[in-house]
C-alpha cells in the first residue's frame, strides 16, 4: 500500500510476513483451517516416526562384522582402527564392524578390495526402511506424500513442490525443470564416460563383471590415483578439523 510510506526493507518485511500468514492458512475458512492444522500435526508426527525408524534401522539393523583381517585388504589403517573400536563397543572385541552410515560406508566402498562385502554394505544402506519389519517406512512415506498433496491443494497449490519452491530462488517447478534439462545431457554424458573408464579398468585387472553401484567409489578412486598420482588418504591430513580452522581464522 503506497499510503504506508515504507522504505524498501520495511516493504520487504511486510510482504514476507503477509506471505507467511497466507502460506499458514490465514485466508482459509474455519473448517479448512482445522483441516490444515490436523494435516500439519499428522505430518509432524509421521516425520518424527520416519526419522526414528531410519535411525533405528541404521544403528540396530544390518551391520557388517568382519572376523578375518585379510578381508580388510585395501582399507586405511585409521579406518580399520575405527572399525575395531566400533566392534568392541558393540561387544565384538578383536573384530571389525561397519554400519550403513556415510562415515562408515563411503570409506569402505572406496578402499575395500572385497567386492562381495562392498555389495552387502551398499545394499544395506539403500534398503534402510524398506525391509518389511517394524522399522519399515514405505507406508509412512505414502501417507506423507498424500498429506503434503492435500495441504498444497488446500492452500491453492497444484503440488507440494509448487508449495515448497515458492519460497526458494527457483520459485517454480518449471524453472527447476529448465535447469535440470540444461545439466542433464552433459551430466549424463560425463557419467557414461566415467563408467566406461571404470569398466575398462575392471577388464584390465581381469575382472569378469559389469560395473555396479557398489563399485563406483572404489574404481573412481583407483582412476584418480592412476591419472593424478594421488589418493584422498594422502591429502586427508591437510584437511583435518584443526588445520581447516587454523586456515580459516589465521
Located regions from the model:
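Extended, charged alpha-helical coiled-coil/arm scaffolds that mediate oligomerization and mechanical coupling
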Residues: 4, 10-48, 54
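Active-site-adjacent "gating/activation" loops or surface patches in catalytic cores
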Residues: 89-128, 216, 220
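Aromatic-rich surface patch/π-platform used for binding flat ligands and interfaces
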Residues: 1
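Membrane-interfacial helix termini and the short, flexible loops that connect transmembrane helices
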Residues: 112, 121, 125-135, 163-169
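A conserved hydrophobic secondary-structure block that centers on an alpha-helix together
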Residues: 16, 25-39, 128-161
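Alpha-helix N-cap/helix-start motif at coil-to-helix transitions, marked by capping-box chemistry
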Residues: 8-12, 115, 142
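Active-site-proximal, well-structured secondary-structure segments within enzyme catalytic domains
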Residues: 9, 13-14, 42-45, 52, ...
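Conserved aromatic-histidine-acidic binding/catalytic patches
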Residues: 9, 24, 28-31, 109, ...
Amino acid at each position: 500500500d503506497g499510503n504506508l510510506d515504507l522504505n524498501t526493507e520495511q516493504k520487504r518485511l511486510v510482504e514476507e510476513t503477509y506471505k507467511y500468514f497466507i502460506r499458514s492458512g490465514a485466508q482459509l475458512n474455519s473448517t479448512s483451517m482445522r483441516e490444515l492444522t490436523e494435516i500439519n500435526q499428522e505430518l509432524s508426527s509421521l516425520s518424527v516416526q520416519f526419522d526414528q525408524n531410519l535411525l533405528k534401522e541404521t544403528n540396530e539393523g544390518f551391520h557388517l562384522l568382519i572376523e578375518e583381517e585379510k578381508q580388510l585388504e585395501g582399507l586405511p589403517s585409521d579406518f580399520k582402527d575405527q572399525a575395531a573400536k566400533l566392534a568392541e563397543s558393540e561387544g565384538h572385541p578383536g573384530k571389525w564392524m561397519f554400519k550403513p552410515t556415510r562415515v562408515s560406508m563411503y570409506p569402505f566402498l572406496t578402499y575395500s578390495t572385497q567386492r562381495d562385502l562392498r555389495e552387502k554394505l551398499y545394499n544395506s544402506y539403500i534398503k534402510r526402511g524398506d525391509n518389511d519389519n517394524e522399522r519399515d517406512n514405505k507406508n509412512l512415506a505414502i501417507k506423507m506424500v498424500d498429506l503434503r498433496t492435500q495441504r498444497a491443494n488446500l492452500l491453492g497449490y497444484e503440488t507440494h513442490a509448487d508449495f515448497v519452491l515458492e519460497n526458494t530462488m527457483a520459485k517454480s517447478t518449471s524453472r527447476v525443470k529448465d535447469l535440470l534439462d540444461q545439466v542433464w545431457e552433459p551430466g549424463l554424458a560425463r557419467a557414461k564416460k566415467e563408467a566406461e573408464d571404470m569398466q575398462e579398468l575392471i577388464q584390465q585387472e581381469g575382472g569378469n563383471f559389469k560395473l555396479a553401484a557398489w563399485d563406483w567409489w572404489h574404481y573412481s578412486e583407483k582412476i584418480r590415483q592412476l591419472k593424478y598420482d594421488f589418493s584422498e588418504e594422502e591429502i586427508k591430513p591437510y584437511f583435518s578439523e584443526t588445520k581447516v580452522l587454523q586456515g580459516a581464522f589465521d
